[in-house]
Amino acid sequence: MFSDKMILIAGPCVIEEEETTLEIASRIQELVTPYADRIHWIFKSSYDKANRSSINSYRGPGLNEGLRILSKVKDTLGVEILTDVHSPEEARAAAKVCDILQIPAFLCRQTDLLVAAAETNAVINIKKGQFLSPWDMQGPVDKVLSTGNNKIILTERGCSFGYNNLVSDMRSIPVLSGMGFPVVFDGTHSVQLPGGLKTHSGGQTEFIPTLTRAALAAGAHGLFIETHANPAIAKSDAASMLSLKTFEALLPLWDQLYTCVRSFEMASV
């Protein structure tokens, strides 16, 4: 589905203004273009962050306006698009624009959502719930496969570890890989401190380089990275997003590590 290239799902957490979204997408494209023969970039952003900590938090422009902006990004840059969906109705609408439909971690066991998304024949990215063991993801996988759609990505995004904290168990990467689909590591949500700032989530972005290196070394097929020109003023997940400047600095490291691990795996066959 993605050949041997490293999968890189990258973009801002939530769609802000059209101009801002296009600027971020354009900058990411500039940064990844030199790696085009080795990295498969997919732009991501959400039209609705339905699980914000506070009722007063910005959720996004909504389904219709959000899909219009994502369509503009797709047409302008010629990039594949991923967004998350929350209901069967949203899945059917989003599939008209997006190449990949993402099942949010909190919704990864919702049968009707999984089946409806899969029936669109889009690629389905299932994020592992913070409350699930990696082997429990076989259930969501089977629900997608029941429709005849076998275009699946599995994303590891950390596991709940007490209150307001997540940990990443790298053993989950080979376990998930054993299900036969590409495994992506979410390097930004994995450093979240859910609800850690009372009305919004905190984060420890200083650990993103360490965790992303570990995930690639463990055999992950790619990374999921939320990035913004200025995370401090971002409208969602400001505490856990990576700045575009740091994203640029980490790209060659990710590329080299992924290439090294894949070369070693090929030599071991």
Swiss-Prot record:
Chief subcellular location: cytoplasm
Location relative to the cell: Cytoplasm
Protein's gene: kdsA
Top-level taxonomy: Bacteria, Pseudomonadati, Chlamydiota, Chlamydiia, Chlamydiales
One Pfam family of this chain: DAHP_synth_1
Listed HAMAP family: KDO8P_synth
Catalytic activity: D-arabinose 5-phosphate + phosphoenolpyruvate + H2O = 3-deoxy-alpha-D-manno-2-octulosonate-8-phosphate + phosphate
A biological process term (GO) from this entry: keto-3-deoxy-D-manno-octulosonic acid biosynthetic process
Protein name in the entry: 2-dehydro-3-deoxyphosphooctonate aldolase
Taxonomic superkingdom: Bacteria
Keyword Transcription assigned: no
EC number: 2.5.1.55
Organism from which the protein derives: Chlamydia caviae (strain ATCC VR-813 / DSM 19441 / 03DC25 / GPIC) (Chlamydophila caviae)
